[in-house]
Amino acid sequence: MPSPTYQQFSVTTALSAGVATAFDIPINGCTNWTVIVRNTGATNPVTAATIAVSALGTLFSAAAAITTGIPLAAGTSLDTIVGSLQPCLTARLTLTSASGTTVSIEMVGS
C-alpha cells in the first residue's frame, strides 16, 4: 500500500500593530488539513483571526471569524483550524494583533 503524500507549509513572521495580515496557505487539493498558529511573541496577543478558502486560488469564500482561542496569548498555540473533507487550493488566514507580535504558522494536509 503506498504511503500518503503530505502537503506542508511553515512560516514565522511579525504582525505589525493593528494591521490585518493575510497568509495564503497552499492546501493544494488536500481533503483533510490542519493549521496551527503559535504566538511566538513575548507579551502581546493575537487579537483577531479569520479564515477563507478558495477552490482555484482566485475567488475566496467569505471570511469566517475564528473566535475559539482568540485572543491568543503570547507563547500559546491555536490548533482548531481544520479542514475535514474540505479540499481547496488555498486557505487565507488573516491575523491581527492590536499591539503587534510574532507568529509561526504550520499546516499539514493529505
Where are these regions (language model features)?
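Beta-strand signatures of extracellular beta-sandwich domains
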Residues: 34-36, 50-52, 104-106
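Tight coil/turn sites that cap or link beta-strands
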Residues: 18, 74-75, 88
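Exposed aromatic-hydrophobic patches
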Residues: 21-25, 77-84
